[in-house]
Amino acid sequence: MQGLIELGLRRLVLCPGSRSGSLATAAGLLASSGQLQLNTAIDERSAAFLALGLATAGGSAVAVVTTSGTAVANLLPAVIEADRSCQPLLVITADRPIRLKACGANQTVNQEDFLRPACRWCGNGAPEGLHAMASHAVLELAALAWSQAHGADQAAAGPVHLNLPVEEPIHAPLQEHQPLLDAVLASDEASLFPLQPSTIQSNRDVPRLDPSRPGVVIAGPWRGLAQDLSAHQQAVRSWLVCSGWPLLADPLSALPVELPGRLHHWDLQLEQLISPEPLQVLRLGPLPASRRLEVWLKRNAGDQVLITEGEPRYMDPLGLATQWSGGLAAWCCAQPLDQASRPLSADHSAWLRRDQALGLWLEEQLVSEGPVSEPALAFQLADLLPPGLPVMLSASSPVRDWLTWSGRSGSDRRCFSFRGASGIDGTLSLAMGLALETGPMLLVTGDLALLHDSNGWLHGQSDGPPLVVLLIDNGGGGIFQQLPIEQASPKRFDALFAMPQRVNPIALAAAHGVPGRSIAVIDDLPEALSWALAQQGPVLLRVCTDRHADAAFRRKLRSAAQNVEPGV
């Protein structure tokens, strides 16, 4: 544990268990000396998502420690998300020694293999037990795990698994603890092993695009580390200035709202974005959550270059782009860019005028009074939130509605959503982790996503993070209402797909000590937000909507948007 702290570990999420007792004791001693921030969690699945939220916000690996057996299996959903989202996560599991393997011993499984397919690297302690390893071997294991989690060997950051067999006796006498802590505190070494930061390298020669010819930049969700974001943002700005290309950005791209050429309502006008010649396309990271954009790219695009932030795996489901994994900042540095500002072309200026007209039109359509619709909620909410307040959007309808309906205000803040595997798993726990690291935050989630991770409320007890949870309660899986599924199976749609649950979310939150309020009409949203943001810990705001009516409303709005004429 001390070795990991020397490398940069600052936070650890600890789950209960006997076999992991020595790890728990070490974490407790280091936390008591101020060297480690310690969170505890009884549900390993929720704990791993909490750690992932912390790591995403902080830009550095957070450890989650569990005992043996099914505890390890419960880590898999968060490990998959960390893998697909390219975020560092350090999973440390206690295991039985080799003598208890494959002989029917209790709580003994092949846990060393459970997480392997989704991990950047898996390491094991000595089969006989951690006690059989020399100190330098333990430190080498820690150093290797830490470097792999942060993107060693030309890979992107991601999860690693340290599986540590522990032999009995597994609980040292109390009098043996203090000498260990004294030894740690007495060490005057600056570092056990200084770790040199890895440099992202490309998997091939640098592909080129011509900024003097027409093109477009499409920015998907940011998949780099927090500390690399500033350089990425500057690189985007430099390319936009020298090329004069418009920008179609996902709210999760973490790009500033005032970037030149940025379209805020592009998802509503893709059919109108026409160019007389095939456009070059600079794609940043994975595609935004828009099937219409995929169709548009297939129909309109010329040469495409896809830049990832160290992710060497193929990331183009359309099969249209040349991929380069060295990161955008390095890509821009590898080719000479004209520093002179290039204006938007006449065609692209028309795109921008239409975008501005759509913004004014949406103000008229998505009014701040009357019953709550989900498009109006996304539009109004983005305007009402304090400047700079970050938002997490659950990976279902909320993230799609924010992309389409929130407009300029929705892009004027940092937005998070864990769409690596596009699941609703761990939604509340992820948001708790983000808020613990960033401070006040808003989570926008659906009812099934919140209920699926209701154990996340446990992280809000006693000094919980300042998290406002805005629950869109539409009686089931509203995302399915927007797909052709209902027409294919109209009679049993609710039972087979929407799956509404009879749970009172306000009462469930209250059972965990979390206060809550219900919002009846959208007029009440400003006062409810003011109350929620004034609370010291987690709070729940429940908004009831009609998923049937909202699905029809979205279709109506999207159809009408095609007739909005651009301003002069």
UniProtKB/Swiss-Prot annotation:
It catalyses: isochorismate + 2-oxoglutarate + H(+) = 5-enolpyruvoyl-6-hydroxy-2-succinyl-cyclohex-3-ene-1-carboxylate + CO2. Binds 1 thiamine pyrophosphate per subunit. CDD domains: TPP_PYR_MenD, TPP_SHCHC_synthase. One of its GO terms (molecular function) is magnesium ion binding. Its EC number is 2.2.1.9. It is an enzyme of class 2 (transferase). Keywords: Magnesium, Manganese, Metal-binding, Thiamine pyrophosphate, Transferase. It comes from the Bacteria. One of its GO terms (biological process) is menaquinone biosynthetic process. Its cofactor is Mg(2+); Mn(2+); thiamine diphosphate. Pathway: Quinol/quinone metabolism; 1,4-dihydroxy-2-naphthoate biosynthesis; 1,4-dihydroxy-2-naphthoate from chorismate: step 2/7; Cofactor biosynthesis; phylloquinone biosynthesis. Pfam families: TPP_enzyme_C, TPP_enzyme_M_2, TPP_enzyme_N. Catalyzes the thiamine diphosphate-dependent decarboxylation of 2-oxoglutarate and the subsequent addition of the resulting succinic semialdehyde-thiamine pyrophosphate anion to isochorismate to yield 2-succinyl-5-enolpyruvyl-6-hydroxy-3-cyclohexene-1-carboxylate (SEPHCHC). Belongs to the TPP enzyme family. MenD subfamily. Homodimer. This is 2-succinyl-5-enolpyruvyl-6-hydroxy-3-cyclohexene-1-carboxylate synthase. The lineage of its organism: Bacteria, Bacillati, Cyanobacteriota, Cyanophyceae, Synechococcales. The gene is menD.
